[in-house]
Amino acid sequence: MPSVLAGRYRLERLLGAGGMGAVYRAKDLLREQFADPEPYIALKVLSEAFAQVPDASALLYSEFALTRHLRHDNVLRMYSFEVDTECQRAFITMELMQGMTLDQLLCERPLGLPWRELRTIALPLLDALAYAHARGVLHGDVKPSNVMLGDDGLRLFDFGLGQAKEGTLPGLPHLSRDRINAWTPGYAAPELLEGKPLAASADVYGVVV
């Protein structure tokens, strides 16, 4: 994979990797050219293996569209969906946050968090989910590693297993997530593990377990 995607985004450091792809800290060279003091973004690109899966680019676009549909202070901001013509790899650009994920915080605090601190996480997270559900979007994979805690507050991210309710984003193709079967044991609602459809209750389950 080239070090610069679409002639604009220079990959600098791997931030994390999952089943669909990897997330990098990247520099937006166009923003740098125009003297933007903060030219850094997060960039998620499909892995070489997953890029060969049918509908892989469409699944990534679905994640982008679902997240972009939500304009909420506690949902990670999406910027663009693009395809690099050299390596034919789809990617999305998004807000880069400084901080740690909730699972990293919990690893540092094995005895748990006091309610005073926990409520500052749980309340904005539930508010983000309530907003998403009201806008017809289901997250599908609520877990600590998909919650970022930073100086600018909490952000829910990674709608890769998300879905739009009927009538929401009608132009978005209905794609099956069955083949990636990425529900997280311990956070996935029992009905998801039984193969039942995703519902808002499954997102709430991921918060309370």
Give, region by region, the residue ranges found by the protein language model.
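Activation segment signature within eukaryotic-like protein kinase domains
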Residues: 121-122
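Activation segment
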Residues: 161-163
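Conserved short submotifs of the Hanks-type protein kinase catalytic core
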Residues: 87-101
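Conserved activation segment of eukaryotic-like protein kinases, specifically the C-terminal portion
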Residues: 175-191
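Protein kinase catalytic-loop region centered on the HRD/HxD motif
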Residues: 127-137
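Short beta-strand micro-motifs within the conserved protein kinase catalytic domain, predominantly
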Residues: 77-90
